[in-house]
Amino acid sequence: MRTILPMLLLLASQLLTNKQLYAQQQEDTRLFRVYEDNDFLNIRGKGTDEAYTNGTRFDLFYTKNHPSSFVVDRKLPHAGDSSINVFGWSLMQVMFTPQDITKTTFQPDDYAYAGGLFVTHSLYSYNPEKKYSYQTELLLGVMGPMALAGQAQTFVHHLIHYKKPMGWDNQLGDDPLININFTAEKQFASYQKWIEVIGGGQVFYGTAMNGVAVYPMVRIGIMHPYFNGYLSQYGTAKQKGEHKGHRVQAYIIVKPEAQVTFTNALLEGGLFSDNTHDISGKEVVTKPANGLRTIVYSANYGAVVALGNFSMSFIQNSSSPWIKGVYSHEVGNFSMYFVW
């Protein structure tokens, strides 16, 4: 009896300690994101309304405490046995316009009117021990009039009393968008919990876009480790005990990138559409005359601020021209995240 009683007390103490630790470390499992790309959002106050002019996206990301039963998820790359796997579903609409949206005529030496609407299923798989990740996105959607980009832009411009876009009758034609996008990232260096240096590479394959990209990424500030998973980058579960109150993140991101593009349906038209329109009784091909630039350089920089379950980010993208003979371009992204 003298032996059993101390053992029972020790076991009860251990169970209580484990329960308290679980309460302190319990992680969130859901993240909802509202994501807005717009070239009017500009950190230098020089907004425009041209080229890649808008992208609106809604995402639901989630983790599971058991292997996914969805057969597609089981086939996607995982970052090892100890990986943190974040699944996601997204809906996005994007639009491109030429510089002068008051003209009704086709403008061959500028970006064509184009719109896309698509659903994305994703798996972001992070290995917190070996500091690498695999991120896979499966994209399915449409481009052309079926994407309703013209109606969306016209409605918003009417709502804010801005000039009406007049050239959507010349937009690139209907076409299916099917793509797989894969990203691999690896941490190269870090300093305590304040600085991380990460390298990444991307491959895009499908009817929407074909190409590759490489980039370094630097994060500086008060932040959770990047490879602890996507959700932890934008929120912190409510802590207890000695961890109580540690729910703030504030950090900057710098990410230059070089991209080689082989095809891009939203810039040059899809595989199955001839992109001809009847203009004044003549069949005219309404897509840019000069073709794609193969190599595009860009710089992404901005900041993330997270307080508890809510966070916001602003990222500015400055890019060299995507089409030969046109202009460089800047797009701002403002996103809000709620984690639970």
Predicted regions: what is each one?
Residues 24-66, 91, 97-100, 261-263, ...:
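Short glycine/proline- and aromatic-enriched beta-strand/turn motifs that initiate or cap beta-hairpins
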Residues 44-51, 202-213, 292-296, 320-330:
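Solvent-exposed loop/turn segments connecting transmembrane beta-strands
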Residues 32-38, 87-95, 138-144, 184, ...:
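Transmembrane beta-barrel strands of outer-membrane/channel proteins
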